[in-house]
């Protein structure tokens, strides 16, 4: 049986960039990793409806720069324009440190090219008790309209309330997972339904590129 490797980790430094950019002393490393993880969890929970696809973190001395890739920047900024200020204040209060936070927003013009947002779309449909095949079909159609070269979606759990859990997958186009130069976007999420948790995995093939540079 073939052993599966994470599609993003497999391509780090080739076609994928790191989501965190910083160096630290060995004694501080684990604390900063935990802090990065907390920041991402907090922002994803706080901005659950803002279509956040990715959060990059960069550290410089005592400053933390956070870049949020979102399909709905208006929900992040807020009507009064103080949404970012409130997020920074909340992070400083919760982390209880003296670091300076800076948050920038990057607008995603084609959200259906992002595997994270496609997965969230399917999860939302499943939580609304929609048939899983219809949810997958709609997600594939949206991705194809956005211009992807290939997409693969896998769902696992008690699908449509079945007594026995199973997994099913659909693939449209090419998804070359063993090609390093293939620009693969991958994500996984969960849909919490009345029948239990359903796992969702999405692979999107956007084309080939030589390197991130």
Swiss-Prot record:
Q: Which InterPro entries match?
A: KH_dom-like_a/b, KH_dom_type_2, KH_sf_prok-type, Ribosomal_S3_C_sf, Ribosomal_uS3_bac-typ, Ribosomal_uS3_C, Ribosomal_uS3_CS
| Pfam families cross-referenced by the UniProt entry | KH_2, Ribosomal_S3_C
Keyword line: Chloroplast, Plastid, Ribonucleoprotein, Ribosomal protein, RNA-binding, rRNA-binding
Q: Where is this protein found?
A: Plastid, Chloroplast
State whether keyword rRNA-binding applies.
yes
Q: Name one GO cellular component term.
A: cytosolic small ribosomal subunit
Superkingdom of the source?
Eukaryota
Please list the GO terms describing molecular function.
rRNA binding; structural constituent of ribosome
Q: Which cysteines are joined by disulfide bonds?
A: none
Annotated GO biological process: translation
- Every KH type-2 domain range: 39-109
- Which NCBIfam families does the annotation name? rpsC_bact
Oligomeric state and interaction partners are given as: Part of the 30S ribosomal subunit.
Q: Which family does it belong to?
A: Belongs to the universal ribosomal protein uS3 family.
UniProt name for this protein: Small ribosomal subunit protein uS3c
Source organism of the structure:
Mesostigma viride
- Taxonomic lineage per UniProt? Eukaryota, Viridiplantae, Streptophyta, Mesostigmatophyceae, Mesostigmatales
Q: What gene does this protein come from?
A: rps3
